[in-house]
Amino acid sequence: MSKRDNLYLVGLMGAGKTTVGRLLAKHYGCTFYDSDHEIEARTGVKIPVIFEIEGEAGFRRREEAVIAELTTLSGIVLATGGGAVLSPANREHLRTNGLVIYLRGSPEQLCERTRNDRNRPLLQTGNPLAKLRELYQQRDPIYRELADVTVDTARQSVAGMTRVLYGKLDLLKGEATSFDPAG
């Protein structure tokens, strides 16, 4: 399997990974996966329930197993959970099996996008903006180091972000091995 056969989206919660991922999969004729949705489908419960019963560590173990499995597939677009990059094993799977796309948004922007979403356990706090700032501080350097492509989501529509991504991915196609979802 070529590194360019898969696209993996990383970024904080609310960055648009699932929405953009679906559009990329449609555009390139790939199968779309969302690691959080896969975990929910396999367990039969929502992410907050897993956090409540198993804690974040239990959820991260499940996430690691799902990412290890999905990254063996070819011709996929995968939206990862915001904290997936905290695992060295996940970073290695993503780095070696596909192109990593970082959707970077400011904590303020992401707080606005997620303010009514109760399916995000880490934001169920008295100050979600402070939590997003903390997560950004912790994870942004990891996302940047891992990413083959970074797109700033500030003041961009989903259509605008995907246009930027198509252009950047087309440029990458000209380098070494090209992205070819057909394998």
From Swiss-Prot:
Gene3D superfamilies: P-loop containing nucleotide triphosphate hydrolases. It is an enzyme of class 2 (transferase). Its cofactor is Mg(2+). Its main location: cytoplasm. Mg(2+) binds at residue 18. CDD domains: SK. The keyword Cytoplasm applies. ATP binds at residues 14-19, 120, 156. GO terms for cellular component: cytosol. Pfam families: SKI. GO terms for molecular function: ATP binding; magnesium ion binding; shikimate kinase activity. InterPro entries: P-loop_NTPase, Shikimate/glucono_kinase, Shikimate_kinase/TSH1, Shikimate_kinase_CS. Its EC number is 2.7.1.71. Keywords: Amino-acid biosynthesis, Aromatic amino acid biosynthesis, ATP-binding, Cytoplasm, Kinase, Magnesium, Metal-binding, Nucleotide-binding, Transferase. Binds 1 Mg(2+) ion per subunit. SUPFAM superfamilies: P-loop containing nucleoside triphosphate hydrolases (SSF52540). Pathway: Metabolic intermediate biosynthesis; chorismate biosynthesis; chorismate from D-erythrose 4-phosphate and phosphoenolpyruvate: step 5/7. It catalyses: shikimate + ATP = 3-phosphoshikimate + ADP + H(+). This is Shikimate kinase.
